[in-house]
């Protein structure tokens, strides 16, 4: 193996954008983010409720039908 060609492997802190919990991982990346972690994901918490978020298309169609009714 050639010396000095491999990226630096270091510990980085990832913060969950949902629950703001911090996790430490080893990575070659300088910065990274996580939307849902094991602390707040329904699979790991045992929460059986379905969380549905409306996307852009659903919001657009809702606004379109609302404006057509006027």
Swiss-Prot record:
Alphabetical list of Gene3D superfamilies matching this protein: Ribosomal protein L31
Q: Which InterPro entries match?
A: Ribosomal_bL28/bL31-like_sf, Ribosomal_bL31, Ribosomal_bL31_A, Ribosomal_bL31_sf
* SUPFAM superfamilies, per database record: L28p-like
Its GO CC terms are:
ribonucleoprotein complex; ribosome
Supply one GO molecular-function term: structural constituent of ribosome
Single Gene Ontology BP annotation: translation
Q: Which key words are in the record?
A: Ribonucleoprotein, Ribosomal protein, RNA-binding, rRNA-binding
Q: Which ranges form a coiled coil? A: none
Q: What does this protein do?
A: Binds the 23S rRNA.
The Swiss-Prot or TrEMBL record describes its family as follows: Belongs to the bacterial ribosomal protein bL31 family. Type A subfamily.
Q: How does it assemble?
A: Part of the 50S ribosomal subunit.
Question: What NCBIfam families does its record include?
Answer: L31 (TIGR00105), PRK00019.1 (NF000612)
> What is the designated name of this protein?
Large ribosomal subunit protein bL31
Q: Which gene encodes it?
A: rpmE
């Amino acid at each position: 193996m050639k010396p000095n060609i491999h990226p630096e492997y270091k510990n980085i802190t990832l913060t969950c954008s949902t629950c703001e919990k911090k996790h430490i991982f080893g990575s070659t990346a300088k910065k990274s983010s996580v939307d849902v972690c094991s602390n707040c994901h329904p699979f790991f918490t045992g929460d059986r409720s379905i969380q549905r978020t409306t996307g852009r298309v659903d919001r657009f169609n809702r606004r379109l039908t609302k404006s057509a009714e006027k």
